[in-house]
């Protein structure tokens, strides 16, 4: 009797094999999951959801027909149903993952930090200048810990400061040093960076407190070009910097005009909202009319600095006290409020170009850069190093700094072309992985999604006009670097008024045509 019962059990087990109908049910459930996920993705317009839903319905009808007509045990039909179910499930899971990466890229940064360094002259420099440095008046580092030196000699060190120039960072560092050394440090304040650095070089002060954003300013001063190699950093303090501007969170950007500042600061390493801007580009966009205006301002434009009570300064220097200050200064200059930004620096710019696999652009003339790199006239391909030099070079260009602004616009076009090319779309996932942490922005992912959805829905044929403002060269004292004459550009009033009008026209929905900038003149 037991043998008979065993055969019955085996027979019943065979009957319980999964049929093609079961796999079809999995396919239907996977299709519903996928369609719901696709519908919830903010970058896809409703029209695309309807199209995808229609295609999916056709697939389900065809597979359903063969599932009914063929035997339930048909291996081919079961395999087809299973494979389609797996593909739909995997895609339904992958879409939210990709969305989360984009969201992280555009929303992970709302503020950043700045570094304040404590500088001292290097032992090598001290040894080479015995007139100022000797064993009786000098503290030698001899490879010792910088922090230990500051603590051990806290009663003797004189700290050079420039509170007038960089109040918040200077006071923050002084307080940190007081706490670290358990004493009130001795300071000698200066009216200008140049005077503070001079006293460090001649041993009037032992150390200098200065934000790293000012190091490039110092190296622009004649006689201090080697400041970076002449000094050592004994210690550094990190201070949190918060932007006054919130994320652009509204989906209204798909229907309302907006303007974004694209800046490139001249620092290496990690990004910071404090630093000089080598690139000062305004991009005005009207999604309804499909108009874009790209406007470059000379980095050395001599304009009022809001953080110095409107005293005149280089545009590039406004960012030293924070990008918010740059945006306020530009807003006052062009008469349109600037509150949205995208910021990169030298290192992150190269990372972005590398992630794209280089870019292609149309170079209007042949030139050789100061580092020896040659750029032919016509269509050229640029790797990350070549692209960086292309947007930085100015001395070997016919129009100097003004032609550099044009180069920056050409590179921006090259980036846009590469991102929207088939190759860029295929490698979009790799690009996202590589450019993470390469930008600082207050543009939210919701804004990006709404623009992408509008582009996919309407296939907008964008009309782009480009202008780079020019001016006359001169030498002036700057608010952020008092006591020294620096090279500046007086931007032409006539051209500032013209580009301000262009921005107004974009916002008004006018159809733009590329025009010549008016002749330069001042009011």
Put a short name on every predicted segment.
Residues 74-97:
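Internal/C-terminal transmembrane anchor helices
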